[in-house]
Structure formats: structure tokens, C-alpha cells
Amino acid sequence: MVFSSYMLPALPYDYDALEPVISAEIMQLHHQKHHQGYINNLNEALKSLDVANATQDLARLIAINPALRFNGGSHINHSLFWEMLAPQGKGGGVPPRHELLKLIEKFWGSFDNFLKNFITSSAAVQGSGWGWLAFCPQKQELMVQTTANQDPLEATTGMIPLLGVDVWEHAYYLQYKNARMDYLKSFPSIINWDYIENRFVEMSKQ
């Protein structure tokens, strides 16, 4: 089986578009260096997987799995992350409406209560990881989840990621230093709730 190479997705905005919440320097490094690096490593792991499959090398197949999980998860998470953001004045920070808002209010009482829960849970991630607004299509339930390192939410929990925030230090340290909470408190003003609501509508039909 031959795998196609993955490529770095283009951002739907300029590197400086999310300022002052996320600096252009961070966005460029995060996208061009970190995300591209994960993709390069993923493609190398897939090449090795090809060889291992062709030779039926079970030990090599097992050894490749951590690299696939880490770098594949990184690519999934970051590809979603870029789409979940929007500049202020161009949709960023405009609260959700319609059915998603109703469901958020059902589970948290208010949109503000949800944001507090999301920020607090994401800030509490030990080391590196992600904070998520997750959706379970089978139960039509929302919940806040966190994942360690670059674990992809759906592959590890079965939940659908609607909103994610990267709490790896490379996502904020150049600008916020060790003040992760300051980064997270600023983050809601660049969330693209239109994209997330459309994703919710699509996923709720599954």
C-alpha cells in the first residue's frame, strides 16, 4: 500500500491577522516550522510503514506507531486549529448562535460559564497538550476535554473536536512567557464560532 504525502495547509488569514492575541512571529513559527516539521516527520513515518508492510516486518510496524500517533495527531490538531481561529472584526470572538449556543447553555448554563470552564481546564493541562470543546453525536452531548501531547481527540476518545486550543509552549511562550492563563484569557476573542457552528451542524447529522 502506497501512502500519499501530506502537505502543509495554507492559513485562511495572514500571519499578523490574529494580533494582538497571537503575534505574527508566533504564527509564522508555529505554522512554517512546527506544523511543517510534524508533517515532514509524519511523511517519513508513512514511508517506513510502507516498507514494513511490504516486508511484513512486525517489529518495525510496532516501532513506527508512536511516530504515527504523535506526528499524525499533530497534523490533525493543527489543521483544525488554524480553521477554528479568525481575526477580530472578521468573525473572531463573535459568540455562537442557533443550536450550538442552545446546547452550550444546556450543559453549562451560559456561554460565559462554558468559556470559564474551557479556559480553566485548558490551563490545568500538565506539560503540553490541548483543550477541547468535544461533541458526542450519539448522545448529542457537549463536554470540555483535554488531551496530552499531540493525541488527537477523536482517535483517542471517540469524541468530535469542535473547538481546540493549543497549550504547548510554542503556541504562546514568545509572547506570554510562562503566563499560559493570560494567553487563554485572550484566546476567546479570536475563536471562529461560525466555522465551529458549521462543523457542529455537519457532525450532529452523523
From Swiss-Prot:
Needed cofactors: Mn(2+)
Keywords, in A-Z order: Manganese, Metal-binding, Oxidoreductase
Cofactor: binding details: Binds 1 Mn(2+) ion per subunit.
Reaction(s) catalysed (UniProt annotation): 2 superoxide + 2 H(+) = H2O2 + O2
E.C. number: 1.15.1.1
PROSITE patterns per UniProt: SOD_MN (PS00088)
GO molecular function, one term: superoxide dismutase activity
Superkingdom classification of source: Bacteria
Residues annotated for Mn(2+) binding in this entry: 30, 78, 166, 170
PANTHER family: SUPEROXIDE DISMUTASE 2, SUPEROXIDE DISMUTASE [MN], MITOCHONDRIAL
Family listed: Belongs to the iron/manganese superoxide dismutase family.
Job description of the protein: Destroys superoxide anion radicals which are normally produced within the cells and which are toxic to biological systems.
Binding partners and assembly: Homodimer.
Name of the protein in its database record: Superoxide dismutase [Mn]
Natural source organism: Chlamydia trachomatis serovar D (strain ATCC VR-885 / DSM 19411 / UW-3/Cx)
Lineage, opening ranks: Bacteria, Pseudomonadati, Chlamydiota, Chlamydiia, Chlamydiales
